[in-house]
């Protein structure tokens, strides 16, 4: 099985779309104290970039890869609800799973020097360890989770960073950046 570990912000939800969820939430909230999880799934998230979705769909069609959501958006919905949102935004495949949260599940001892990149790389590694059927995979994120991008001055019991990683460093371009699609395809071929 081929898998794309997909972040959203800075990959398919680009900086020009950030904040669009707040406009949607104003329209549907019945009371100010209403939890985000009580809102319709469409109102919980910012819109995806249409051109970024086109690139993602091309990759999915070419490779047959499945999607596992590594984005922190996963805390606001179920896999089923995220699949509904993907369909409403034009993504041709629903996610098959979310990566877990290694910190909340006490799989590791959290340290204050950790950042999102280190934690997310551990979550992806943990998911892959539980799914030996994965033959090809790539993580796509706007956080630099490459082994050279994550460095700590202290020693930890975990190996940080990912080998199969594509960094979308330009948050206003994301997956549309020149050369990004080819890098992703190289990991999935």
Residue spans for each PLM region:
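Structural motif
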Residues: 3, 66, 136-138
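Short, active-site-adjacent cap segments at secondary-structure transitions
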Residues: 12-13, 75-77, 145-147
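Active-site neighborhood of HAD-like aspartate-dependent phosphohydrolases
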Residues: 1-64
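C-terminal cap/substrate-recognition subdomain and adjoining C-terminal extension
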Residues: 80-189
């Amino acid at each position: 099985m081929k898998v794309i570990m997909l972040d959203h912000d800075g990959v398919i939800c680009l900086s020009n779309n950030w904040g669009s969820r707040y406009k949607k939430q104003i329209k549907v909230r019945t009371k100010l104290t209403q939890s985000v999880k009580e809102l319709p799934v469409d109102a919980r998230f910012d819109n995806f970039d249409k051109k970024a979705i086109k690139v993602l769909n091309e990759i999915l069609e070419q490779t047959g890869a499945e999607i596992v959501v590594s984005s922190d958006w996963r805390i606001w919905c179920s896999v089923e609800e995220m699949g509904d949102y993907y369909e409403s935004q034009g993504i041709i495949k629903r996610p098959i799973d979310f990566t877990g949260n290694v910190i909340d599940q006490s799989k590791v001892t959290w340290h204050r020097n950790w950042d999102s990149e280190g934690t997310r790389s551990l979550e992806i590694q943990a998911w892959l360890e539980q799914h030996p059927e994965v033959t090809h995979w790539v993580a796509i994120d706007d956080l630099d989770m490459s082994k050279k991008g994550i460095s700590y001055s202290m020693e930890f019991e975990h190996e940080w960073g990912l080998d199969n990683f594509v960094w979308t460093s330009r948050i206003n371009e994301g997956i549309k950046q020149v050369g990004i699609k080819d890098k992703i395809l190289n990991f999935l071929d």
